[in-house]
């Protein structure tokens, strides 16, 4: 990880940092971080907060260059922010949080006449900064466009969805073309078996000699924005459907069984036989998928549901998020971690910079289960990122 370049480390039990070292804080852009270092007994000297806050662009570029150019990160984002002595032995500072990202830092004390810092006990403090645009009012309506008939029919229903019911975020299930080679879930196949991440399914468009299917999808995005809302797309980046563009032209970008057959992913003891799993050990695939996310951002998409995101390596997400946030810093990444370990979800939120995650309270409406689950869920959410509680999803019966 990104660490301060300190080679002669001296820890001091008589120093107290607030917030405490090793804390994990969730903040929003526009907030400030108040830091205090107390030296007891007071001594002459100066104090600073060593951090990469304020240099998110440098940190993102190092992450990107590690994947794209093979360069080792050198922690160039770290710098010392002076703390002011507000009382004998008490040093304080208010640090503005102007960038979205995950940052670290730790206060240190330089005794008078010394250039060697002394540190309070413990590892770095971590601060996750999210977009102020999504601090509140984040009710999500998940749209299955096929059930509406077309993208334009969804547009016609937006007054009901956004005005009457009050949803600010409209999220579509994957809008991509699906395979005919091996399809499940009826004639049209599963929407999570995408064949082309850079197109939309023409079956969800109306015939129009002037506007392409992608253009009609753009109309939907624009209509949501016109009502002051945000538009999310479900992007199943862990896999494709059979005979996808990637499988046809880049079969080496996929996982294979020992006998050479393509590997299908699965969860809960169920094999998803209509899918083939991508292999993110391939740097070219990582770069391609980051460009897929950027393509949809340029189309106006504000956020992504990351289907089966826990199956994709944390380092890959760190790269994709860094690449996207170079151009679109407020993009929201919603992790679908159902089926994965809670520790993996925590890491993806805390280190890979994904914003939100599915709550593990899934298809449950029993009060006692809510009461038993919520205290720990709230504690996790306050540290790592919002846990989204869905009343229903496409994975369970509709209410």
Q: Each PLM stretch: what is its role?
A:
Residues 7-40, 126-137:
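Non-catalytic, glycine-rich low-complexity segments
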Residues 144, 275, 301-305, 396-397:
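Glycine- and acidic
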Residues 41-99, 110-130:
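Aromatic- and glycine-rich beta-strand/loop motifs that create alpha-glucan
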């Amino acid at each position: 990880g990104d660490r301060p370049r300190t080679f002669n480390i001296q820890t001091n039990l008589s120093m107290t940092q607030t917030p405490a070292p090793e804390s994990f804080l969730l903040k929003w852009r526009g907030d400030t971080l108040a830091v205090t270092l107390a030296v007891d007994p007071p001594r002459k000297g100066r104090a600073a907060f060593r951090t990469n806050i304020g240099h998110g662009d440098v940190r993102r570029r190092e992450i990107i260059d590690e994947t794209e150019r093979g360069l080792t990160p050198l922690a160039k984002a770290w710098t010392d922010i002076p703390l002011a002595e507000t009382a004998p032995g008490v040093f304080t500072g208010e640090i503005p949080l102007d960038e979205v990202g995950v940052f670290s830092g730790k206060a240190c004390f330089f005794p008078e006449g010394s250039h060697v810092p002394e540190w309070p006990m413990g590892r770095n403090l971590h601060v996750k900064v999210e977009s102020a645009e999504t601090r509140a009012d984040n009710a999500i309506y998940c749209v299955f466009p096929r059930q509406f008939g077309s993208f334009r029919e969804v547009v016609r229903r937006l007054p009901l969805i956004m005005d009457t019911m009050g949803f600010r975020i409209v999220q579509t299930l994957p809008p991509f073309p699906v395979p005919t080679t091996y399809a499940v879930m009826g004639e049209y196949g599963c929407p999570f078996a995408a064949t082309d991440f850079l197109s939309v399914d023409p079956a969800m468009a109306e015939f129009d000699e002037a506007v392409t299917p992608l253009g009609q999808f753009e109309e939907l995005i624009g209509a949501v924005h016109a009502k002051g809302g945000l538009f999310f797309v479900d992007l199943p980046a862990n896999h494709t459907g059979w005979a996808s563009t990637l499988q046809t032209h880049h079969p080496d970008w996929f996982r294979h069984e020992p006998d050479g057959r393509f590997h299908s992913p699965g969860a809960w003891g169920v094999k998803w036989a209509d899918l083939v799993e991508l292999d993110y050990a391939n740097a070219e695939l990582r770069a391609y998928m980051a460009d897929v996310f950027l393509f949809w951002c340029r189309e106006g998409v504000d956020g992504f549901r990351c289907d089966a995101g826990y199956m994709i390596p944390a380092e890959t997400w760190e790269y994709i998020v860094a690449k996207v946030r170079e151009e679109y810093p407020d993009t929201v990444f919603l992790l679908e971690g159902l089926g994965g370990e809670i520790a993996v979800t925590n890491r993806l939120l805390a280190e890979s910079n994904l914003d939100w995650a599915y709550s593990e309270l899934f298809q449950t409406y029993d009060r006692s289960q809510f009461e038993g689950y919520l205290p720990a869920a709230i504690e996790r959410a306050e540290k790592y990122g919002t846990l989204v509680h869905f009343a229903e999803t496409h994975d369970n019966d509709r209410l």
